[in-house]
């Protein structure tokens, strides 16, 4: 039958038979132009099976420290017409950070924005001047919704404590930032019934001022671990990740502790948080699913229920959450999973049903994506954040830089220019001099470690300048009347003392008795130091009797160094016209001057604007040297996903410079990469594998040597190199990753091509790589693109695409184009009249790319899956647009059917939108607008009755 004609005719007859009704704008569609609602493959990061069930861990990718909120469909700020969930997660040093993820069913999630573009402009956040923020930055964020406003609170370990960000529009911003200027461990924000804001941190609670800027009440250690020993059968330790929820008459606070079974949920409850009411506790060991949220679900009958949303360590992929259904007993305690038994790979029925087309769409949304770098992502409001007061270079008198500032430091003119500090005697000696003909003997120091030589530096010292000091020292003498035989070595300092008595040590060194020793060091004078009246002094460390020994000193030197410090500039963070997909994050702050999607259309350009560091140290604890790769700026990465993960990219390396290395890396502190390296004009393709071992340890496990040979760490592995011909400027690299979450191991096989068609193995399989448990990076493996310089800046590499697949070359499967052909056929069958023009145009662009991919005789499954999944996702979006009638909300937020949110009944909530009702014969009845039928409408109806379908009436956007 002609579905289009029958449907229009029935509608037109209904209009003609009803006086005073105007033809309502509605979608028009035909049998051969309807996108299928047959479930497509789920995204790489979903465990939604498509049959109404899902498994845990749920997202198959790294989403730690989760905090989840629900915005009810009845909320005036909800424009989606159905319950919406938002989630935030830890991203530490990555930029942008604090991703806001969205879901309609608590199982399928996608990123809609970030809270901030960069967390600070500090050296540590920007990999500047040898500093870094690995394992630091943003930790354990808390997301809350209160009185129409959204709040995110998180702590930082290296950026002056905790911050609160808030906005009235969580998906579009802008966000306002508040610095609390103090730290809280794993803080969670909570608004009490009077609307007062509180921070929950472990077993501590703090009330904030109404403007959220100040702590006005502190209640610490309100409970103790010991009081729960009987309830839990063990004494809990930790109390991390506490979040508080009011459910019925009780306040429930899930927290985690390390119990005898491992990561364990302790659920606390009380009728009042602070009035002394008893806190009860219940222990849940849920297969190591622990820290996270309780989430509320509409039961469809006017009631709601609460369920668990906790994550577990699932390396090498990362820390992955799971939605764990709960039933609540008459005692007011939840029972999670199967009688509180939960295991990885458990399968559950989904708690929220969605209409078939919307279900098909959200299953394809992902936290990772392929990308062809077409600069077609929308500009985000967080990119425009300009909160920064940038550090500026000091104003320096260059005539005092690079010259010796100490007068008579070799004492060839005796004691001229020198005066004793804290008494003591200064004597020029020639017998036993350390250098030249004369040295200085320092005697009669008494009990003063500060007794020694001093010299005025007034008019010579400058704020913000780094100085290098040195001195040669020897001591042989025992002090008169004091047994100092036990003092075999002692610390000496060359220091700057300011007029107010403050002392900054410039050079520090240990001098052994009887050994002539030169101590050296550097120090940067603070920018706010009062340098007027300052002087250079020599001291020994404060110590026991016998440490104010006589000594001889010579060649005291102090030189101001030329400023080699790199200072931030506004161009680093100002938008550069390039907009990346939201799945991408930079390792630390990017420098926007040195990456682009516009310099070469359809390519990502990474330019080396900085050189990597050969001296940088890990800054969070004592975890040793950083590799070159770890100090490379503008490393662009995505999450990995568990199981088989293949990434393919195409690089143009024609503009590399000597000392440059560029490629594709899978990394945490341990890493592997395939890259092109240029040395002495010759480019070589190779593989690097770096396994971090926490340094050299003694028998007790203490780190005794945490230094590395950086060149050796990133040398190409034997048997894994290819010398590139001079004309080989295009290189294709494929990284086939196997992330085995059961064993915790990652293995990688690299492949390469020089023509994009014929592929060869690049070395042997690399691995296994594991998680080092030092918490130094503290995240699952990431995978991304990089380019770094050791010798020269200015070289650049262009990346054509980033194509994902879950099929590995080593699987031995032929390239399968059937799904790509099916998507193309489906797209070709559609008619533009039924869809919003902007979404239709997106589909046409993706259809063209899909056809080009098919015509190119693809050589890998990546080259098929990337365009197929992109096109299939857009077809699913069109199906939702068709059902909603106007496509007003990407993701189906303006649906005419609400779905069965509880699995009970058949809700058809309209989200406040006017709908057509459905008759038994599947025709659509027309809704009344209270307007008269105009001649134009009557003409349109006449044409419809005649079977003429060339006229299209589209719903106007609202």
Each predicted region: which residue ranges?
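Sec-dependent signal peptide cleavage junction
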Residues: 22-36, 927-928, 955
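Extracellular glycan-recognition regions
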Residues: 35-45, 332-334, 340-402, 510, ...
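Blade-edge beta-strand/turn elements of extracellular beta-propeller
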Residues: 42-60, 109-131, 165-182, 211-237, ...
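Hydrophobic core segments of beta-strands in well-ordered, beta-rich domains
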Residues: 64, 68-94, 113, 132-134, ...
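Short beta-strand-plus-loop segments that form exposed binding edges in beta-rich domains
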Residues: 312-313, 538-547, 787-791
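Extracellular and organelle-lumenal recognition/adhesion modules and their flexible linkers in secreted
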Residues: 395-566
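Beta-rich interaction/scaffold domains
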Residues: 813-893, 936, 944-946, 951-953
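C-terminal low-complexity, Ser/Thr- and acidic/Pro-rich disordered "stalk" regions positioned immediately N-terminal
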Residues: 872-873, 877-929
């Amino acid at each position: 039958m002609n579905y289009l004609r029958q449907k229009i005719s029935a509608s037109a007859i209904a209009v003609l038979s009803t006086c005073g009704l105007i033809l309502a704008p509605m979608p028009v569609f035909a049998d051969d132009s309807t996108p299928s609602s047959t479930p497509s493959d789920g995204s790489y990061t979903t465990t939604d099976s498509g049959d109404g069930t899902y498994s845990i861990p749920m997202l198959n990718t790294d989403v730690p420290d989760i905090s989840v909120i629900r915005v009810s469909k009845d909320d005036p700020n909800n424009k989606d017409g159905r319950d919406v969930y938002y989630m935030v997660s830890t991203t530490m040093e990555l930029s942008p950070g604090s991703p806001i993820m969205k879901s309609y069913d608590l199982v399928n999630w996608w990123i809609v924005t970030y809270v901030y573009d960069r967390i600070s402009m500090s050296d540590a956040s920007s990999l500047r001047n040898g500093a870094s923020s690995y394992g630091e930055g943003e930790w354990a964020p808390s997301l809350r919704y209160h009185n129409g406003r959204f709040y995110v609170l998180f702590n930082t370990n290296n950026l002056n404590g905790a911050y609160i960000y808030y906005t009235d529009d969580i998906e579009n911003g802008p966000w306002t930032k508040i610095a609390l200027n103090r730290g809280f461990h794993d803080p969670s924000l909570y608004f009490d019934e009077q609307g007062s804001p509180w921070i929950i941190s472990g077993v501590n609670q703090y009330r904030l001022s109404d403007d959220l800027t100040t702590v006005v009440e502190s209640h610490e250690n309100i409970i103790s671990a010991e009081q729960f020993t009987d309830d839990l059968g063990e004494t809990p330790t930790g109390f991390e990740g506490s979040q508080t929820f009011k459910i019925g008459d009780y306040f429930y606070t899930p927290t985690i502790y390390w119990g005898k079974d491992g990561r364990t949920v302790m659920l606390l409850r009380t009728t009042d948080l602070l009035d002394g009411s008893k806190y009860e506790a219940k222990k849940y060991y849920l297969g190591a699913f622990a820290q996270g949220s309780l989430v509320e679900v509409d039961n469809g009958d006017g009631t709601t229920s609460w369920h668990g949303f906790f994550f577990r360590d699932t390396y090498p992929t990362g820390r992955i959450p799971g939605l764990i259904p709960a039933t609540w007993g008459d005692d007011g305690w939840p029972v999670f999973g199967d009688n509180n038994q939960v295991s990885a790979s458990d399968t559950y029925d989904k708690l929220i049903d969605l209409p078939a087309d919307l279900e098909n769409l959200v299953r394809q949304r992902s936290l990772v994506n392929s990308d062809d770098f077409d600069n077609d992502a929308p500009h985000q409001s967080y990119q425009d954040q300009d909160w920064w007061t940038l550090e500026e270079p000091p104003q320096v008198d260059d005539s005092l830089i690079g010259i010796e500032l100490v007068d008579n430091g070799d004492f060839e003119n005796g004691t001229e220019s020198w005066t004793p500090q804290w008494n003591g005697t200064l004597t020029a000696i020639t017998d036993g001099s350390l250098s030249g003909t004369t040295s200085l003997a320092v005697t009669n120091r008494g009990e003063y470690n500060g007794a020694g030589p001093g010299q005025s530096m007034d008019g010579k010292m400058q704020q913000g300048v780094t100085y290098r000091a040195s001195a040669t020292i020897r001591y042989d003498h025992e002090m008169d009347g004091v047994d100092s035989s036990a003092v075999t070595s002692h610390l000496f300092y060359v220091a700057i003392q300011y007029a107010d008595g403050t002392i900054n040590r410039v050079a520090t060194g240990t001098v052994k008795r009887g050994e002539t020793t030169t101590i050296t060091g550097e120090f940067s004078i603070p920018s706010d130091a009062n340098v007027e009246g300052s002087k250079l002094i020599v001291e020994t460390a404060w110590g026991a009797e016998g440490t104010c020994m006589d000594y001889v000193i010579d060649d005291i030197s102090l030189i101001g160094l030329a400023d080699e410090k790199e200072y931030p500039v506004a161009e680093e963070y100002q938008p550069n016209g390039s907009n990346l997909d939201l799945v991408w994050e930079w390792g630390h702050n990017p420098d926007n001057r040195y990456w682009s999607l516009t310099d070469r259309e359809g390519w990502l350009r990474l330019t080396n604007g900085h050189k990597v560091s050969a001296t940088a140290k890990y800054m969070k604890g004592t975890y040793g040297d950083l590799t070159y790769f770890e100090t490379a700026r503008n490393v662009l990465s995505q999450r990995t996903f568990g199981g088989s993960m293949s990434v393919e990219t195409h690089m143009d390396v024609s503009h590399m410079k000597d000392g440059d290395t560029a490629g594709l890396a899978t990394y945490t502190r341990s890493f592997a990469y395939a890259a092109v390296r240029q040395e002495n004009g010759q480019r070589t393709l190779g593989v690097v594998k770096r396994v971090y071992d926490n340094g050299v340890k003694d028998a007790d496990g203490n780190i005794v040597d945490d230094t590395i040979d950086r060149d050796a760490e990133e040398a190409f592995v034997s048997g894994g190199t290819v010398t590139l011909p001079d004309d080989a400027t295009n290189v294709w690299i494929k990284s086939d990753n196997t992330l085995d979450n059961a064993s915790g191991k990652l293995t990688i096989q690299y492949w390469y091509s020089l023509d994009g068609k014929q592929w060869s193995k690049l070395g042997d399989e690399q691995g296994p790589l594991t998680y080092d448990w030092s918490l130094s990076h503290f995240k699952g493996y990431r995978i991304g693109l990089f380019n770094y310089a050791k010798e020269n800046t200015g070289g650049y590499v262009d990346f054509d695409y980033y194509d994902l697949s879950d099929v590995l070359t080593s699987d031995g499967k032929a390239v399968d184009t059937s799904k790509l052909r099916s998507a193309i056929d489906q797209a070709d069958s559609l008619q533009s009249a039924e869809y919003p023009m902007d979404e239709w145009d997106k589909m046409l662009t993706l259809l063209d790319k899909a056809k080009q991919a098919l015509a190119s005789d693809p050589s890998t499954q990546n080259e098929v899956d990337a365009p197929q999944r992109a096109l299939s996702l857009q077809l699913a979006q069109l199906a939702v647009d068709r059902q909603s009638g106007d496509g007003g909300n990407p993701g189906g937020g303006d649906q005419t059917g609400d779905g069965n949110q509880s699995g009970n009944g058949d809700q058809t909530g309209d989200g406040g939108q006017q709908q057509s009702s459905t008759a038994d014969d599947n025709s659509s009845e027309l809704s009344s607008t209270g307007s008269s039928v105009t001649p134009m409408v009557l003409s349109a109806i006449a044409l419809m009755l005649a079977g003429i379908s060339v006229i299209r009436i589209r719903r106007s956007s609202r």
